[in-house]
Amino acid sequence: MAKTSTSVIAAKTLVHAAALAPIALLGWQFWQVWQSGSDALGADPVAEIEHRTGLWALRLLLITLAITPLRQLTGQAVVIRFRRMLGLYAFFYATVHLAAYLTLDLRGFWTQIFEEILKRPYITVGFAAWLLLMPLAITSTQGWMRRLKRNWGRLHMLIYPIGLLAVLHFWWLVKSDIREPALYAGILAVLLGWRVWKKLSARQTTARRSTPPPATPR
């Protein structure tokens, strides 16, 4: 038991390090640009910051959605312990993504966000995804699970439309080459399709068990 706990702690430490590595690298490169005007973030540093943080938010969201299929395929229930932290990191990167847009792109004129939401569909769906993520992040604790009871599970089913909105945000943002958003759309389709298939299979199994056997002729 102690060995398992130690392994989980070590694995969580690695996950934390891996999840924080992209933002640490981005922060270091931003510092270089700020201090020396280097091209560490390319010709358009603001666009690069927004792109990377948004991309990692989407990646971590998809990894979070992959936890349940991974548990079902491997039978390793321990992977569920990583779902909450991965989901919180997805929200963290999404928040940094939004903050970068507000502070670096809009340059602090935050009231323009409402005009942008109405004018640009990709911002509309992206902002909607972030708003839906917020209650999931807030209620991710054990205390909220106890308070909400069955409603907690219903609330956290919002992760599915959030995934769709996030992919759609990326798809609409890209103007020409849609190969990358198409890849993430395909991954999301597989993850959601797996859940639909498992649910239908469970219903069929339940129906077969509840169907009485045919009467034998006397």
Curated annotation (Swiss-Prot):
Its cofactor is FMN; heme b. One of its GO terms (molecular function) is electron transfer activity. The keyword Flavoprotein applies. It is a multi-pass membrane protein. One of its GO terms (biological process) is protein repair. The keyword Secreted does not apply. Its main location: membrane. The lineage of its organism: Bacteria, Pseudomonadati, Pseudomonadota, Gammaproteobacteria, Lysobacterales. Part of the MsrPQ system that repairs oxidized periplasmic proteins containing methionine sulfoxide residues (Met-O), using respiratory chain electrons. Thus protects these proteins from oxidative-stress damage caused by reactive species of oxygen and chlorine generated by the host defense mechanisms. MsrPQ is essential for the maintenance of envelope integrity under bleach stress, rescuing a wide series of structurally unrelated periplasmic proteins from methionine oxidation. Heterodimer of a catalytic subunit (MsrP) and a heme-binding subunit (MsrQ). GO terms for cellular component: plasma membrane. It is found in: Cell inner membrane. It holds the Pfam family Ferric_reduct. HAMAP family: MsrQ. Keywords: Cell inner membrane, Cell membrane, Electron transport, Flavoprotein, FMN, Heme, Iron, Membrane, Metal-binding, Transmembrane, Transmembrane helix, Transport. It comes from Xanthomonas axonopodis pv. citri (strain 306). This is Protein-methionine-sulfoxide reductase heme-binding subunit MsrQ. Belongs to the MsrQ family. The chain crosses the membrane at residues 14-34, 60-80, 86-106, 121-141, 155-175. Binds 1 FMN per subunit. Binds 1 heme b (iron(II)-protoporphyrin IX) group per subunit.
